[in-house]
Regions:
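Conserved glycine-rich cofactor-binding loop
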Residues: 10-11
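Conserved glycine-rich Rossmann-like NAD(P)H-binding loop of the short-chain dehydrogenase/reductase
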Residues: 24-39
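Catalytic Tyr-X3-Lys loop
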Residues: 80, 87-106, 121, 125, ...
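Substrate-binding pocket helix/loop in short-chain dehydrogenase/reductase
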Residues: 85-86, 93-98, 180, 187, ...
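C-terminal substrate-recognition "lid" of short-chain dehydrogenase/reductases
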Residues: 106, 199-226, 231
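Active-site helix of classical SDR
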Residues: 109, 145, 153
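Alpha-helical segment proximal to the catalytic Tyr-Lys
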Residues: 114, 158-162
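Residue(s) in the substrate-gating loop at a strand-loop-helix junction
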Residues: 129
Length: 232
């Protein structure tokens, strides 16, 4: 049975990915930072193994991966955001966003890569954002990290393709998760109307795209927008 490792799997898009990959027949493990109760609930529901780990900590990632089966599919979903003017972002906030959103991918890829290289096969799916494509006012740091994810995805696809390893990413639009929990309902409604499909997305919408990319054997270096047409 193929093994999928999903980061940030205790809630939102990550939890939906755990469910989707389990339903698709994968053995699934997931990393989570601190929400023990949510992680336990997802694990009990799906049978997936949960490991507490901050992906910004390189050694913690290596230790976590060493406890798990070899990874066939790595889903780099863990991410955080910050809303505010660029002049109001502290150095610590800036550094933390890059440490998690970009550094976390670096650490997780390097942790699973030796086994993938040995097998000459593997699949890596990163999570960017439509704001990584076009930028968002008051989300400069978040947009910058997600733009970096897009560039990293393409570079890794070039580098790892000759070794049989595919690297792609998904770029969610407005998805109804905890990340938008503080957005006023009327603002969410306005955002929905800006998308040609006239609605906001769900975590399951993104998870379905991830499962597709995991099985798309001739697709690499691509960004799959999941945004209802918000950004074309």
């Amino acid at each position: 049975m193929r093994h999928a490792l999903i980061t940030g799997g205790s809630r939102g898009i990550g939890a939906a990915a755990v469910r989707a990959f389990t339903a698709a027949g994968y053995a699934v493990s997931f990393l989570y930072e601190k929400n023990d109760a949510a992680a336990a609930a997802v694990s009990a529901e799906t049978g997936a193994e949960a490991v507490r780990c901050d992906v910004a900590d390189a050694q913690a990632v290596l230790d976590a991966v060493s406890r798990l089966p070899e990874t066939d599919v790595l889903v780099n979903n863990a991410g955080i955001c910050h809303y505010g003017l660029i002049s109001q972002i502290t150095q610590a906030q800036w550094d933390r966003l890059f440490a998690v959103n970009v550094g976390g991918i670096y650490h997780c890829v390097n942790a699973v890569l030796p086994a993938m290289l040995h097998r000459q096969s593997g699949c890596i799916i990163n999570v960017s954002s439509m704001w990584g494509q076009v930028g968002a006012s008051c989300e400069a740091c978040y947009s910058a990290t997600k733009g970096a994810v897009l560039a990293l995805t393409k570079a890794l696809a070039q580098e790892l393709g000759p070794s049989g390893i595919r690297v792609n990413c998904v770029s969610p639009g407005v998805i109804l998760t905890d990340m938008v929990a503080n957005v006023a309902p009327e603002v969410l409604a306005e955002l929905a109307q800006e998308a040609p499909l006239g609605k906001n997305g769900t975590p399951e919408d993104v998870a379905q795209a991830m499962v597709y990319l995991a099985g798309a054997g001739f697709v690499t270096g691509q960004n799959l927008p999941v945004n209802g047409g918000f950004v074309l």
